[in-house]
Amino acid sequence: MAFILERAQAPQPASPATATLPVPTVQRLRRLNLAAAVFHLASAVLFLAIATDFDLPITASFPTEDPALTEQLFPAEVLTEVTIGYGVAAFSLLSALFHFLVATVANRPYNRAIAATQNPFRWIEYSLSSTLMIVLIVMLLGDYDIGALIGVAAANVAMILFGWLMERHNTPGADDVDWYPFVFGCIAGIAPWIVGTIYFAGALGNADEAVPTWVWALFISVFVMFNGFAVNQFLQYRRVGPWRSYVFGEGAYIALSFVAKTLLIWQVYFGTVR
């Protein structure tokens, strides 16, 4: 981990190692990260305190020659069950941990990275928390197959790593920005939503039961929020309006992360575990 952070914080030629942030900016970012840590922690603790147990299975299908299952060559077998409440609290706790780290013990390397228009801490946290989020989302939409869930997780991690690569190899506003990492990240990132859309559309096609309102809200709102991160990075590298400041984009990432996680937490609560 130390090697990864050291490499990630090494600035590119366009971002000199001597770059520093003004003291007011350092203080503002520290307060913002501390506030985010407190709110994420409070959300997780409150959720765990009031949520009831709600488990979903993780399944796998294996070929069989059981005569009793001649019409079902690949019956689904439950491997384990996941308590959704713990998963929901976990991604919020991960965010709280990373915000607390960059506001305290990792504050200096964080500030150096921000001055060099990079934030490796963000990408490491997202690779964990947002991946857990998207896996829980597709499970709530009805996908329990372990192979599909691993694919969803891998695609999301790839999206995050492409975002990190975009940041490592480019400088916002440069004439020679390489957009390939951004485009590849978008392609990888849409895969989990294709899986989710298949299950959501399948639920819509079920004439016997109406899709619960909370599922509509969950699918649409979190999809919009996830795409907000890509829009934020695009605006950073196009240097549009206030995004001319990398620090503004960093603040937008923090706000987007908090809103997306808060939406998911409470939509899950009102839809399933209350």
Where do the protein language model's features map onto the residues?
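Right-handed parallel beta-helix
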Residues: 122-125
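Polytopic alpha-helical membrane-helix bundles and their juxtamembrane interface segments
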Residues: 3-38, 42-120, 131-274
